[in-house]
Swiss-Prot record:
Protein name: 4-hydroxy-3-methylbut-2-en-1-yl diphosphate synthase (flavodoxin)
UniProt-listed InterPro entries: Dihydropteroate_synth-like_sf, IspG_bac, IspG_bac-typ, NO2/SO3_Rdtase_4Fe4S_sf
Cited SUPFAM superfamilies: Dihydropteroate synthetase-like, Nitrite and sulphite reductase 4Fe-4S domain-like
Enzyme Commission number(s) of this protein: 1.17.7.3
Cofactors: [4Fe-4S] cluster
Keywords, ordered alphabetically: 4Fe-4S, Iron, Iron-sulfur, Isoprene biosynthesis, Metal-binding, Oxidoreductase
Pathway: Isoprenoid biosynthesis; isopentenyl diphosphate biosynthesis via DXP pathway; isopentenyl diphosphate from 1-deoxy-D-xylulose 5-phosphate: step 5/6
Protein species of origin: Salinispora tropica (strain ATCC BAA-916 / DSM 44818 / JCM 13857 / NBRC 105044 / CNB-440)
Reaction(s) catalysed by this chain's protein: (2E)-4-hydroxy-3-methylbut-2-enyl diphosphate + oxidized [flavodoxin] + H2O + 2 H(+) = 2-C-methyl-D-erythritol 2,4-cyclic diphosphate + reduced [flavodoxin]
Length: 390
């Protein structure tokens, strides 16, 4: 007799499948594939030729937690800027090459950590593979075969009718085979599409067909809200199956926002240690406090807190006490006041107007107890200082 036959739900499988076995490459100092942690990357939006602006944006990405950065190289002026950027960047730099095979050699010579090539729009690319493989191999520079639905080779479009998952995979594996003929396997692959369903199907096929590390991305995902949804759905499905070694959330938004979303996706799946997590109820007719405002003010007040801390902001006595007790720190609100919980214990009850101030003070105290080095803007608030929320 089984649990199912007794009407008892079977023991659920682990939430995530084991990571897919893949080769490992090094993008600068960052391992990709081979069981390494899933890395988060982004792409600069500056003119690469503007070295100072590009380095400034890379510094902002570094502070946000980015691990690898890609820069566009559409012109000779951009090529000329690569040596300075590669030398001064705090992150490994990937040169993004389209149309011009000769720029690949220039990027390798400039000291870039990796090169992305798009086989769909480099006409002479196939003829240059032998030379590229030798140059990249000699320099220890990996190549990303970056296939994109928007620039798929016309021959494959004619064969498949449109940019199907099968067409994307065929393009990627064909280009990989050309490198393999010359003994070069320091490769990672991406097969991006703007439709998450097609994208997921393509990566699943690719994961079964090869052992190269995979870079996940939904191309042209859209503005921040839409792009976040598309990437979260697609990445969540694949990463839960163990597929994916590095990710880039493409958003029509500042690059730093891509890093925030990417890191949050990994944290949500348990693939990265959680940072600050605000748990708040969606509010309903039972709420006796403005939950939206409380949650926003607590989030803003603790931005940059470098510890895995769960803070619950609850608006009523139904789920509030339970959620607050499960969190590291929380409040259950009602009747113009809030019960403050720390590690499951009520430590005080404060007037509604002091809830945000108290939560921030207690969060900073817990962070210091955990040995966290607080950012300058938070350090002055620690130690019981009064917090003013505007």
């Amino acid at each position: 007799m089984t649990a199912v036959s007794l009407g008892i739900p079977a023991v659920p499988p682990p939430p995530l499948a084991p990571r897919r076995a893949s080769r490992q490459i090094m993008v600068g100092s960052v391992p990709v594939g081979g069981g390494a942690p899933v890395s988060v990357q982004s792409m600069t939006t500056t003119l690469t030729a503007d070295v100072n602006a590009t380095l400034q944006q890379i510094a902002e990405l570094t502070a946000a937690g980015c691990q690898i950065v890609r820069v566009a190289v559409p012109s000779q002026d951009d090529v000329a800027a690569l040596p300075a950027i590669a030398r001064k960047s705090q992150l490994p730099v990937i040169a993004d090459i389209h149309f011009q095979p000769r720029y690949v050699f220039a990027a390798i010579e400039a000291g870039c950590a990796a090169v992305r090539v798009n086989p769909g729009n480099i006409r002479q690319f196939d003829d240059k593979v032998k030379e590229i493989a030798k140059a990249a191999g000699d320099a220890g520079v990996p190549i990303r075969i970056g296939v994109n639905a928007g620039s798929l080779d016309k021959r494959l479009l004619a064969k498949h009718g449109k940019a199907t998952a099968e067409a994307l995979v065929e393009s990627a594996l064909w280009e990989c085979s050309l490198f393999e003929e010359h003994g070069f396997r320091d490769i990672k692959i991406s097969v991006k599409h703007n439709d998450p369903v097609v994208m997921v199907r393509a990566y699943r096929q690719l994961a079964e067909a090869c052992d190269y590390p995979l870079h996940l991305g939904v191309t042209e995902a859209g503005p921040a809200f839409q792009g976040t949804i598309k990437s979260s759905v697609a990445f969540g499905a694949l990463l839960a199956e163990g597929i994916g070694d590095t990710i880039r959330v493409s958003l029509s938004a500042p690059p730093v926002e891509e890093i925030k979303v990417g890191a949050a996706i990994l944290e949500s799946l348990g693939l990265r240690e959680r940072g600050l997590e605000i748990v708040s109820c969606p509010s309903c007719g039972r709420a006796q406090v403005d939950v939206y405002k409380l949650a926003e003010e607590v989030t803003a007040g603790l931005e940059g807190l470098p510890v895995p801390l769960r803070v619950a902001v609850m608006g009523c006595v139904v789920n509030g006490p339970g959620e607050a007790r499960e969190a590291d720190l929380g409040v259950a609100s009602g009747n113009g006041k809030g019960q403050i919980f720390v590690k499951g214990q009520v430590i005080k009850t404060v007037p509604e107007g002091q809830i945000v101030e108290t939560l921030i003070e207690e969060a900073l105290r817990l962070a210091e107890e955990m040995g966290a080095e607080l950012p300058e803007e938070l350090r002055s608030l620690a130690g019981g200082a009064t917090v003013t929320v505007h």
